[in-house]
Amino acid sequence: MNKVYIVNILPLLNQEVYDYYYARVGEQRQKKADSLVSAIDRARSVGAGAVLRFAVEDATGYSYDSLDFGIDGNGKPYAEGNPFYFSLSHSGDYAVCAISDSPVGVDIEQERQLSAPFRKRFARDILEWTKKEAKGKLTGKGFFDESPLECYVFTHQKTDGYIVTVCSDRKFDELLYYHLPMPL
């Protein structure tokens, strides 16, 4: 089980949709969302929780509601008992979740609008940034972790204007798009 899920969080800017998904993410995710000032940041946070819920149920067969989630001393979220590993990230209009049977880190970054001469160089910088962020999430030591690490790096650049990088000792092959079902 090595999957990466991505969701567009813009539907969460609608209050009814936001409330629906807010009620379905864990208490820790709700508290995090409540601490944020802007609606878009709250939508990103709840979007990360929503894509985690879907990934858990789709990839593992576990019921999201049957699991307890925690945050370790480095701020890395985990499922109690480690039945699987996951990593979350969000940027711009998207939230992503990588889920695996081994430790994993993921990062997504939105490419900024740049003039043509700068775009190629900056895209490389963004790619390196996402690799470093994903590695830091994998190890739980953060962005400034300078330790050497052998891992597969899966980078996806087909999501318009975004780069997604996964770091793991397992191979990831594709990015799975998940669309938030609208509440009835």
Language-model features, listed with the residues they occupy:
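Core catalytic alpha/beta fold that binds nucleotide/phospho-ligands
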Residues: 1-184
